[in-house]
Amino acid sequence: MRNPPDRRVFLQWLSAAAAAATAATALPLHAAGKIRPDARSALIVVDVQNCFAPGGTLPVAKGDEVVPVINAMAPAFANIIVTQDWHTAGHASFASSHSGKKPFETTTLKYGQQVLWPDHCVQGTDDAALQKGLSLPTAQLIIRKGYNKGVDSYSAFEEADRKTVTGLAGYLKARGIKTVYVAGLATDFCVAWTALDARKAGFDVAVI
């Protein structure tokens, strides 16, 4: 059997791929303190959940440090959308659902190649809850993604099959939103996919 890939090297490779895709589409990066949103701007807060914080089931290094940054800039936005990874138990993207497979290996699902993850962000668990202390007083909508048991979902706009849409693009356009700021976890996956799909949907996009 092929040895499982080293997690650090694997994530570095994916991060480099996401960075290249971001550079190719010229998505600007903004420091939180320099943001000046207007009434046609929206903030998308991506997956700031316990599962991605230190001690969670799929932790991102310093994943708890995004909370004060987001809290500091949130009051400037009249329009905030929140996403949550919200998997069913036994989700197809979990390594535990595939005999002989380990986390960070890959398999082929109906829509193509899929990275297999540790069980994480299972619906209704504390692991899937938003991180304590996150304060978003003007949040208007929560997009829960990954609840389709057979399809993974990174982006707030489209599932990983690249066919199933969440309706977020229409929601934003109906409210006259032109510019989308994206912040949260993790930059190399759900933040990157959300930002790239926002650009594809016709919005001006900045990653925080």
Where are these regions (language model features)?
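N-terminal secretory signal peptides and thylakoid transit peptides that target proteins
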Residues: 1-18
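Histidine-anchored nucleotide/phosphate-binding helix
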Residues: 192-199
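Active-site alpha/beta core segments
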Residues: 68-179
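Hydrophobic "anchor" residues on beta-strands that sit immediately upstream
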Residues: 42-43, 81, 206
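Active-site metal-binding loops of divalent metal-dependent hydrolases
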Residues: 48, 85-86, 185-187
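Acidic/histidine-rich helix-loop elements
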Residues: 53-62
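C-terminal segment of N-terminal export signals and the immediately downstream linker at the start
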Residues: 3, 25-45, 50
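A short glycine-rich beta-strand->turn/loop micro-motif centered on a GG-aromatic cluster
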Residues: 181-184, 204-208
